[in-house]
């Protein structure tokens, strides 16, 4: 079924307020979740609300966080987030990074002790809309076997990039360092769909197409994805003095406790390196040139990275956002959550 962006936003905001989140924070979380669903990233959209509601109600997301911004240098800062909702902390951290890059050319802002922040391309697009290049990366729960390994160590550790072209054009790239994000498995479960056998393995280490049999995810491109998830764990965890590797808290372990996750934003002001106008012209030229490339057999069009999601977002603004009926029924119900996510086992979800 499809519903309007405004309706979905209000339903999510109301449910999070029902769980105990203050209206201002609930609106920010809803904004990021609706953004994800509008772009077809359903793994990070409304499917997450029930889990968030349970964690908020149990105190694992701080309903009254005391944020503290520590400016550690002219271009660097740490936002101590007090286990606030991740979307709220990440948006706040990016706002400070943008102000710093405006004045000093570059900014690096670490966000310390936060909750799950969702689709992190939202935050790099904040920077792009301000005319800057945005890069963001964050930790996630351990659920990935390292290349050549049989035991879980790292999380899906996503990485996102966005840069402004001419007008309102934005080039956006957002990826998990696994073949697919864990949320894609959750989305497949909610839709009763199978998954490709390249995404994950079962408890015996055998590739599986059954999303309910998943025991661990696989790194993207083998050793390359493995290396990237290591880098992100170092920059968003080790660098900030936070838990790292398999020490990172599980999303489903103790919903009464804060996640203590880390995220790192990097913002670059093109004016300090060439000129903003020239940069934007060349970026739009890149996008046009990629679109003009002759497609390979089996393809109708060459897209620049993120273009397929841009198209979905524009379409959703006109036609509404696709949402699974079970999720819609939950959002309009009085229930805070139907089944507890506190299983201590992410693969039981």
From Swiss-Prot:
Entry's localization field? Cytoplasm
Instruction: Please give the annotated consequence of changing residue 44 to A.
Output: 16-fold decrease of the affinity for (S)-ureidoglycolate, but same affinity for NAD compared to the wild-type. Strong decrease of the catalytic efficiency
Cite the EC number: 1.1.1.350
GO biological process assignments:
allantoin assimilation pathway; purine nucleobase metabolic process
Q: Which reaction does it catalyse?
A: (S)-ureidoglycolate + NAD(+) = N-carbamoyl-2-oxoglycine + NADH + H(+)
Give GO terms: molecular function aspect only. Answer: ureidoglycolate dehydrogenase activity
**Which pathway does this polypeptide act in?**
Nitrogen metabolism; (S)-allantoin degradation; oxalurate from (S)-ureidoglycolate: step 1/1
Q: Where is this site: Plays a crucial role in stabilizing the binding of (S)-ureidoglycolate?
A: 48
Q: Which residues bind NAD(+)?
A: 140, 174-176, 224, 306-308
Q: Which domain of life is it from?
A: Bacteria
Q: Which Gene3D superfamilies match?
A: 1.10.1530.10, Hypothetical oxidoreductase yiak, domain 2
The UniProt-reported impact of residue 116 to A is:
Loss of dehydrogenase activity
- Top EC category: oxidoreductase
- GO cellular component: a single term: cytoplasm
Keyword Oxidoreductase in annotation: yes
Effect annotated for changing residue 140 to A: 2- and 12-fold decrease of the affinity for NAD and (S)-ureidoglycolate, respectively. Strong decrease of the catalytic efficiency
Q: Which UniProt keywords apply?
A: Cytoplasm, NAD, Oxidoreductase, Purine metabolism
Q: What induces it?
A: By glyoxylate and allantoin under anaerobic conditions.
Q: Where is the active site?
A: 116
The answer to whether UniProt assigns keyword Repeat to this entry is no
Q: What is known about its subunit structure?
A: Homodimer.
Family named by the database record: Belongs to the LDH2/MDH2 oxidoreductase family.
**What exactly does this protein do?**
AllD plays a pivotal role as a metabolic branch-point enzyme in nitrogen utilization via the assimilation of allantoin. It is able to utilize allantoin as a sole source of nitrogen under anaerobic conditions. Catalyzes the oxidation of ureidoglycolate to oxalurate.
- The protein, known as: Ureidoglycolate dehydrogenase (NAD(+))
Q: What is the species listed in this Swiss-Prot or TrEMBL entry?
A: Escherichia coli (strain K12)
Question: Which taxonomic lineage does the organism of this UniProt entry have?
Answer: Bacteria, Pseudomonadati, Pseudomonadota, Gammaproteobacteria, Enterobacterales
